[in-house]
Amino acid sequence: MKYTLLGFGISNKEILKYLLKKGERVFVSEGKKLSEVDKEFLNSFGVDFEENGHTEKVLDSDVILVSPGIHFENDIIKKAKENNIKIDTEISFCLKEFEKINWFPYVIAVTGSVGKSTTVSMIQHVLNKYKRTLLAGNIGIPIAKLLNDDLRADYLVLEVSSFQLFWSDKFKPNISSILNIYPNHLNWHPEMSHYINSKFKITLSQDENDFFVYNPNDEYIVKNLGKVKAKKVPFKYDFEIHQLPEHLRYKQTIENVAAAKTIVEVAGFEFNIDFLEDFEKLPHRMEYVTEINGVKFFNDSKATNAAAVIRAVENFDGKLHLIMAGIGKNEDYTLLRKVLKNSVKTVALVGPIAKDVKPYLDGINFMECSSINEAVNQLFRIANPGDVIMLSPGGASFDAFKNFEERGEYFKQLVFQLKEGKS
């Protein structure tokens, strides 16, 4: 059998390693320029490849494995469908391969606009106290890596994105969950209904023996419950924020904990809030950096859409100086404007997102800066003791950084440099 890997990101790299181990023929087609390291790797295994675009060479294959970010209206995808070539994705491909090696884990899959990584990490953290549990998916651990490293466990927790779900038609987790739905990725999805339908594909193949755990406070989710065949279980909000460990006492964490708690209980285990005492918060998500002259700094670089920014901003009571940066996602910022008007002293805009957000900042004090470095320094000059300066960008990082992690680390480095100069 011959496979084409359409896109050569982190997931397809792991799939390539797996297919080569099996002795399959593989062709790699990357829309952008490949790095020299990637070319060396492909050449060392004698793998044919193309870069800077997808040609009809892609069609000389039995199966095309699509990277999540490939747009569904890509011309080569249309031609592949016309030629009846099987199109598959990492999720469904890997789950079928698990069956071939007689591994049948209990699968828990979580999606949502914000909070996915924190929630799946909490689920794994608690389940590991009972059973061996692996975590993979959109959190940065390719599912195919589990195959390559021959990792097995009783439970498999997956974080899945709308892109991954769009391409996955036969995905049947034992428990699926949608945390929330906010307008997001509308630069990829043509309209909101398309985005919602992609999210709900997480439960499309489930039946009455499976479970769908959902947020009862999200109107987009509640309106679409009729299409769910699995047993429907709403989040349990049976705890107070003050009961959470101190490092988790943020408003958005309530939803994460409610989801994780309900899912763990549906899986048949007790979820004690005390289990989170040793849960390590993920970096770049409401991450406290340091305090300088009474001004606190927070790194929320993972906030790449308006909904995530809103959830972060709501934790502060009018003493916030906010840095927004990066590339916007074709969003409506009306709700963000209302929250900013009540909660921030200053908004510093950096990069392409400035032109998207500026029209919504009437009556809000804002400044445009050429870099995050300039924004940090300008805001620190005007901040008073008791104020907070937070990077919560609201946009993708690709205008200036490789990913949100690199952006967050850069911000923290700037803050510590500032502290050294002030100490």
Swiss-Prot record:
Q: Which SUPFAM superfamilies does the annotation name?
A: MurCD N-terminal domain (SSF51984), MurD-like peptide ligases, catalytic domain (SSF53623), MurD-like peptide ligases, peptide-binding domain (SSF53244)
Which Enzyme Commission numbers does its entry carry?
Answer: 6.3.2.9
| Pfam families, sorted | Mur_ligase_C, Mur_ligase_M, MurD-like_N, MurD_N
Query: Which residues does ATP bind?
Result: 112-118
Q: Name one GO cellular component term.
A: cytoplasm
Q: Where in the cell is it found?
A: Cytoplasm
The UniProt GO MF terms for this protein read: ATP binding; UDP-N-acetylmuramoylalanine-D-glutamate ligase activity
HAMAP family given in the database record: MurD
Which NCBIfam families does the protein's record reference? murD
Q: Quote the protein name from its UniProt record.
A: UDP-N-acetylmuramoylalanine--D-glutamate ligase
